[in-house]
Structures are given as C-alpha cells and as structure tokens.
Amino acid sequence: MSKETPSEDDSRHRIVAVTLDEDSIGRSGPDIEHERAIAIYDLVEKNLFAPEGAEGGPFTLHIAITGNRLMFDIRREDGAPVVTHLLSLTPFRRIVKDYFMICDSYYQAIRTATPDKIEAIDMGRRGIHDEGSRTLQERLNGKVHVDFETARRLFTLISVLHWKGNA
C-alpha cells in the first residue's frame, strides 16, 4: 500500500494562519518588517504543510525561539494541538547571518548601485535563501512535509525573527 503524497491543492495539508512569538522578534527596520508581512501573507496564500502522522488540517503555526531552539507549535484550525517540534538553531546561524549581511548590501544597493550590481547582489541573496530553505526542509524531514516554496517562505520568517543577536 503506497503512502499518500500530500498535495498543495488539498486543503487538509496547508497552513491557514501563522503567528510569530513577539518575545522572539528583535527590533528591525521597515525593510525587515515589510519582508515579514509579505512572507506571512504569501505563506498563508499558498503552501504545502503536512505534519507526519496528523490526520489532516488545515493547520495554524506559531513560530518562536525558545533557548537555542526554533519552535513550531502546530495546531488544527480550531486550536486543538497537533504537535510541537523543536529544531536546533545551530544549522541556521551562519546562513541567517550571511542572509542578513547580503540583505543589508541589497537594500543599500537598490538606492545607489547600478542595475548590474543590484542583480548580482540579488542573485547571491537568492542563493543563500535557497540554502536556508533546503536546510529547513532537511531539518523538517520526517516531522513535517513541506514543498520547496513553503520552506522558502518559512525560512524568510525564521530569518526575520532576528532572534535578538543570537544569529
């Protein structure tokens, strides 16, 4: 008997709401706040999110930093707990640090640099973002099935949590 592969078109395998722990969010500028808002909107609009062993959703997701761990508190739409996963932040530290450095360069470049320089920086930014997304998919393997685009949006949220100097 083959295992059912979750589908993005299946409303049981999706996130319908995302919240970020306010205590985990560091102070950030308007560019980061804007990225956070867009990432949440895009994630809720289109995602594939299927916790292993859960009978289906849709789900809500609360993301927090707890000690040196990333916490995914997954619940059903009605608030019933499904599972909480704690992931070590260690595999993300260098990636997030690099991502913030290149984002700073990108935001400075879009104000003054040539289009070629902006494009080169943006390609680097996307490459680091992809690396973080793949790392997140690997860390969630066996816990939550997510497609690459969902992992990208989740990585953006993890990055913009900007865990108070711990990155």
Swiss-Prot record:
Superkingdom of the organism of origin: Bacteria
Pfam annotation, one family: UPF0262
InterPro entries: UCP032146
HAMAP family in UniProt: UPF0262
NCBIfam families assigned: PRK02853.1
Family per record: Belongs to the UPF0262 family.
Protein's name according to its UniProt entry: UPF0262 protein Nwi_0248
Biological source species: Nitrobacter winogradskyi (strain ATCC 25391 / DSM 10237 / CIP 104748 / NCIMB 11846 / Nb-255)
